[in-house]
């Protein structure tokens, strides 16, 4: 039986060079087939979905018009880059997206020449593009540089810093604003398309440039008035561009990002411009072409595997509550008792559990957009006035507000409460989203209480502890995903500051855990017992202030002391070692070891596989104990067998 391909034209395209050989009338078919291939691929792998479907026509048009990879194409964030990957020689691997050894879910320089700049965090594309444009100019090059940025990413200050700089430099940079929420201005029919084409065309630009040159020879008052008349006339006919024009960009748009008859001529005109910078305002729809995603953009922003026919996602029934939900529910309970408790998120309400708080206390919830710097100092201002702000931000994104943590929070000892979600390794999103560094970058700061929850019940108590801390900032870190299924307390009870807890008493080996590796410590202790080694287990709870009494007790009563954490070098283990060194406890026979994440950026995989590769699972802990004893782990396992 003969089978026919659903994507016959796309099948002929291995690189954008093949795409550019096609007739313009064929580009529509390529886009339709590219959308189908994107849907089919993501249904198998899961991943970011809605944004990619929204830029299928734009992606096709850019690669058709511009000479990529010679022309540099930078995607902000990278959520929308799956169609780009399919067109740029990676279609044969597209069903390995976000799996171990497979394609990254974001653009990645080491993956393809068509990815000139890696991305995953928001609002970096214009800065990177400007750097590349200036490098081109200094080198005497002629290639184009295109940065594609979404309207959501435009809420971050970095994007405007870059635009301000680009406008002042008059650099020939092309910025395409992918407005998929129509938050700036919608395209209004044929007139909008006509004007966009007119204003991007050579005739209009030549007349405009000639008028500018003439204006230089006119009296200043007349020249300024003429300039304002021109700006007013464009602004009157083309709503939405005033801000960008003020920043020094030549604004074109808004145009329908799904209409290739509008996109292609405008992009060709922009490509041929000899001056810059230029901003092309393109309006798109998230989830375009897949009805379930069009109807529910938020639910299809990121998906697990799903059935293409129905849109039903294959979500497994949870065995325990997710940490983010435990945080949100705990915060609600605390806020019911204390009207000073407020919640803050930086464009991640559902990811952090702040959405749960928002349903109960909408007026006490603040989503500040992709603006972590602002979020931290905004929280500091609330704290200065006696409120109890909880700033819920992923570990990897909190890095973006570090100076504000130091300068605006810690130096002033303001009681901002940081809820650090996605601490440790996060799996499919890989190195760009791993919460590896907060133990290290917060641990060096004075005036900070630092906690890590070993399970979901501990998180409830730590939220209550943060509410009670009113004289300094505090943080609690917890991972992505489900808890352990432990018995949950009805209400949180504030913990004694700087005090850990003993979980199991042993004799020879002490395992001191900070965070959710505690479960692996318990498995390791059971395995060590099978080898005749008695192990104590302690849950540190606090990195700062450190439970010095507990640390000294473990060091004095055991031959081996091992710290375990889900963080980089310079974190919890370093604090324990420094304290023991200062106490002279490392001068004698104690065998002290620190288990941390490897000093590298780990590629994406499942969290379990990543932790195993890092040696931070039960097997890795047992291996570390045998190494400290000078024994061969493999040989010991064989003996037991």
Swiss-Prot record:
Listed cofactors: Mg(2+); thiamine diphosphate
Return any one Pfam family short name: Transket_pyr
Pathway the protein acts in? Metabolic intermediate biosynthesis; 1-deoxy-D-xylulose 5-phosphate biosynthesis; 1-deoxy-D-xylulose 5-phosphate from D-glyceraldehyde 3-phosphate and pyruvate: step 1/1
What is the superkingdom listed in this entry's lineage? Answer: Bacteria
- Gene3D superfamilies xrefs: 3.40.50.920, 3.40.50.970
Gene Ontology MF terms: 1-deoxy-D-xylulose-5-phosphate synthase activity; magnesium ion binding; thiamine pyrophosphate binding
Instruction: Indicate which residues the UniProt annotation says bind Mg(2+).
Output: 151, 180
In its keyword annotation, does this UniProt entry include Zinc? no
Q: How does it assemble?
A: Homodimer.
Q: Fetch the HAMAP family from UniProt.
A: DXP_synth
Q: What is this protein called?
A: 1-deoxy-D-xylulose-5-phosphate synthase
Q: What is the lineage of its organism?
A: Bacteria, Pseudomonadati, Pseudomonadota, Alphaproteobacteria, Hyphomicrobiales
């Amino acid at each position: 039986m003969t089978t026919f391909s659903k994507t016959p034209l796309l099948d002929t395209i291995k690189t954008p060079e093949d795409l550019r050989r096609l007739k313009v009338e064929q580009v529509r078919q390529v886009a339709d087939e590219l959308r189908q291939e994107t849907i089919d691929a993501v249904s198998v792998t899961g991943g970011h979905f809605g944004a990619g479907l929204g830029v299928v026509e734009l992606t096709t048009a850019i690669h058709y018009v511009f000479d990529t990879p010679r022309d540099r194409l930078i995607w902000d964030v990278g959520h929308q880059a799956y169609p780009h990957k399919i067109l740029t020689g990676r279609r044969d691997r597209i069903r390995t997206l976000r799996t171990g050894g497979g394609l990254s879910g974001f653009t990645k320089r080491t993956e393809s020449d068509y990815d000139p700049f890696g991305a995953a965090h928001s609002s970096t594309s214009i800065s990177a593009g400007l750097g590349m444009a200036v490098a081109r100019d200094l080198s005497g090059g002629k290639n184009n540089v295109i940065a594609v940025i979404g309207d959501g990413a435009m809420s971050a200050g970095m994007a405007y810093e870059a635009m301000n700089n680009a406008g002042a430099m008059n650099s020939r940079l092309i910025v395409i604003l992918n407005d998929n929420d129509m938050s700036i201005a919608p395209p209004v029919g044929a007139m909008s398309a006509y004007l966009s084409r007119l204003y991007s065309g050579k005739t209009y630009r030549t007349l405009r440039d000639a008028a500018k040159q003439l204006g230089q020879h006119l009296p200043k008052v007349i020249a300024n008035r003429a300039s304002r008349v021109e700006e007013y006339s464009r602004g009157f006919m083309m709503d939405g561009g005033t801000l960008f024009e003020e920043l020094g960009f030549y604004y074109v748009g808004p145009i329908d990002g799904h209409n290739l008859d509008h996109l292609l001529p405008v992009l060709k005109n922009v490509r041929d411009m000899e001056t810059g910078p230029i901003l092309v305002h393109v309006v798109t729809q998230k989830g375009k072409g897949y009805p379930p995603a069009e109807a529910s953009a938020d639910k299809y922003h990121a998906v697990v595997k799903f059935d293409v026919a129905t849109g039903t996602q294959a979500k497994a029934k949870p065995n325990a509550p997710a940490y983010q939900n435990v945080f949100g529910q705990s915060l609600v309970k605390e806020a019911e008792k204390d009207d000073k408790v407020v919640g803050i998120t930086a464009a991640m309400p559902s990811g952090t559990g702040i959405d749960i708080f928002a349903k109960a206390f909408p007026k006490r919830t603040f989503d500040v957009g992709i603006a972590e710097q602002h979020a931290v100092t905004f929280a500091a201002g609330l704290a200065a006035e006696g409120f109890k702000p909880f700033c819920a931000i992923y570990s990897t994104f909190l890095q973006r507000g570090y100076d504000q943590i130091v300068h605006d929070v810690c130096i002033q000892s303001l009681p901002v409460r940081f809820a650090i979600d996605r601490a440790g390794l996060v799996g499919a999103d890989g190195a760009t989203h791993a919460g590896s560094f907060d133990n290290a970058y917060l641990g060096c700061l004075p005036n900070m209480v630092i906690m890590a929850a070993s399970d979901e019940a501990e998180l409830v108590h730590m939220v209550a502890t943060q509410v009670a801390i009113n004289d300094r900032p505090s943080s609690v870190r917890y991972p992505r995903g489900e808890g352990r299924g432990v018995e949950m307390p009805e209400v949180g009870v504030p913990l004694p500051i700087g005090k850990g807890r003993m979980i199991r008493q042993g004799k020879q080996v002490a395992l001191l855990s900070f965070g959710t590796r505690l479960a692996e410590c318990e498995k390791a202790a059971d395995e060590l017992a099978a080898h005749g080694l008695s192990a104590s287990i302690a849950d540190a709870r606090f990195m700062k202030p450190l439970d010095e009494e507990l640390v000294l007790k473990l060091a004095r009563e055991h031959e081996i002391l091992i710290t375990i954490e889900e963080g980089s070098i310079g974190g919890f283990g370093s604090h324990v070692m420094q304290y023991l060194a200062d106490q002279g406890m490392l001068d004698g026979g104690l065998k002290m070891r620190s288990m941390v994440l490897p000093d590298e950026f780990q590629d994406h995989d499942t969290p379990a596989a990543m932790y195993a590769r890092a040696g931070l699972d039960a097997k890795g802990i047992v291996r570390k104990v045998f190494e400290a004893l000078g024994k061969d782990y493999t040989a010991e396992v064989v003996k037991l067998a």
